[in-house]
Regions:
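Asp-based, Mg2+/Mn2+-dependent phosphohydrolase catalytic module
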Residues: 1-15, 105, 121-122, 126-220
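Short glycine/serine/threonine/alanine-rich loop segments
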Residues: 47, 81, 112, 166, ...
Length: 220
């Protein structure tokens, strides 16, 4: 495909992509956090699964959107579980969303600068790179932990812009989380898209706040 003939991408100088739920299937992460962690926590505390789930939900609600929410070290310490080990044991579940790798192959052949912009913990990023080789498609990789601020905050975008030069009017950002997209929009990024099918094992997202696409492949 000639990307210069694409109405959306032909005007793009910088393409920023989220990882989980945008490039990679969120089903892996959902399985870890909604299935495996509750079972391990119930086993550790010698309580039933429902009780463990209630306790975990309280933790999740209190931290969602904060940097601690995305910090493996914090969760391992809080729960007394080796969260990274759980991820490693299930690494075979890691995979691209439908059409995502094809999309990356196309934009790799273009003049667009492609950046991975993620809230992921670095150890999880490393694991996912080992399984998918996704790093080969990006000109730069930026994690919220490096900026000490989650993507949901303006501070993240301010700090990102201090080390990455990009024209707000010619930048596209794609993510599956409305609060992250809102922060990017408020910072001034002109074109944003919300992935509405981030998890292959779950129904389509009902919280659609921005122009929605099933997957990144829809842009080509």
């Amino acid at each position: 495909m000639d990307i210069h003939q694409n109405k959306i991408l032909s005007q793009c100088h910088t393409l920023m992509l989220d990882m989980d739920g945008t490039i990679l299937d969120l089903a892996y992460d959902s399985f870890i956090w909604l299935d495996l962690v509750p079972k391990e926590y119930a086993k550790k505390l010698s309580i039933n699964l429902d009780e463990a789930t209630v306790i975990l939900k309280e933790h999740f609600v209190s931290l969602k959107g904060s940097l601690k929410w995305y910090c493996l070290d914090h969760w391992s310490e809080l729960l007394g579980i080796d969260i990274l080990l759980l991820h490693e044991k299930e690494r075979s579940r890691i995979g691209y969303l439908l059409g995502a790798q094809e999309f990356l192959e196309v934009v790799k052949q273009s003049d667009i600068r492609v950046l991975l912009v993620s809230n992921s913990h670095r150890d999880i990023l490393k694991l996912k790179i080992e399984e998918t080789g996704l790093d080969q498609y990006f000109d730069g990789i930026h994690l919220s932990h490096d900026f000490k601020a989650p993507k949901e905050s303006r501070l993240f975008w301010t700090r990102l812009s201090s080390i990455e030069e990009f024209d707000l009017s010619k930048t596209i950002f794609i993510d599956d989380t409305p609060k992250v997209l809102r922060a990017a929009k408020e910072f001034g990024i002109h074109s944003i898209f919300q992935i509405i099918d981030p998890d292959s094992n779950q129904p389509r997202s009902i919280e659609i706040k921005y122009p929605g696409i099933s997957g990144v492949i829809d842009l080509i």
